[in-house]
């Protein structure tokens, strides 16, 4: 039976929930097959793609990290990395926010082809630019363009966990 994301999947959890012995599967790295659960057209050239696994699996990442998508486009294997824009407090899914690049092979393919229900391979998460490994009492971010997505993830995490930053 396939798992369809539901409202219960979107509940906010704490980091201690990741250590719950009742949880049987935690994905923290490696290559996995994920299903596109939702596509949100943010603007005419920016979309957010949300992914989940067929079975409930806690997807743990540090806010600011990225995943690498492995796609087959025009018969060729293509890999591109995108920062996760969602918060790890949403336990069974993650999102990437992608701006369409005029001549971008992958960004255009995602915008034109990826639909809810489609399967793709994902590697990761990885990356050292995150707020868990580099805690601070106060932060100031200046970002623009693709630099917004790691900041989105961090800000959402701090909000969801009532962080005092």
Stretches with model-predicted labels:
Residues 15-119, 123, 137:
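Ferredoxin-reductase
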